[in-house]
Design a protein with these regions (language model features):
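Bacterial N-terminal signal peptides that target proteins for export
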Residues: 2-19
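Hydrophobic small-molecule pocket/channel-lining residues, especially in calycin-type beta-barrels
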Residues: 34-177
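Bacterial N-terminal signal peptides
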Residues: 18-29
Length: 177
């Protein structure tokens, strides 16, 4: 006569490795998602009709944004026009692990930034601080940019710039070339 207890033990012993493999796969997928499955790389062109520029008398938004994301590194090249109409290019190099990075800013300043992933790994926030000299006075500008993809064809950047004389919020939408 068959002992049902022995049969149950065999099923459990057979299922245990399958359960462990399943848990390993689940863990691997979770870790992969946390390591940046979202990739912001691309050549992006400003979509002015979908963007909101706030109350600024001139637009300080890049018309072209080139982004390269490789592993934990993010680099940007922004092309925009200065208030006097001259084309300006600025570059930035960041790590996406929350460590502080330093890049050249405007008016011979230095910008210190950190990049952090959101809890759901669907967006990043770049928090920056720039100290510059204007007419003999040191001023600090703080900025926060939250990047998120809308599908794979649009990059939305919500920005808040804070200076002693006020705050400016913009929403920039870029279409992928």
């Amino acid at each position: 006569m068959r002992n049902p207890q022995n049969s149950d033990k065999k099923v459990i012993n057979t299922a245990r490795p399958l359960i462990l493999v399943g848990l390993f796969i689940l863990f691997f997928v979770q870790v992969s998602a946390q390591n940046g499955t979202i990739n912001f790389s691309g050549n992006w062109v400003l979509n002015e009709s979908k963007s909101k520029f706030g109350d600024s008398p001139f637009r300080m938004a890049a018309s072209i944004l080139i982004v390269k994301q490789e592993g934990n590194n993010l680099s940007t090249e922004r092309t925009q026009n200065s208030p006097d109409g001259q084309e300006m290019k600025t570059t930035g190099k960041f790590t996406m692990d929350g460590k502080e990075c330093e890049n050249s800013g405007f008016m011979d300043s230095k910008t210190k930034s950190t990049v952090k992933w959101s809890a759901d790994n669907k967006s990043i926030t770049i928090a920056s601080s720039t100290i510059f000299n204007m007419n003999g006075d040191n001023m600090e500008m703080k900025a926060s940019e939250t990047w998120m993809l809308e599908g794979d064809k649009a990059l939305k950047i919500e920005t808040t710039n804070s200076m002693p004389d006020g705050e400016l919020k913009t929403t920039l939408v870029y279409d992928k070339k």
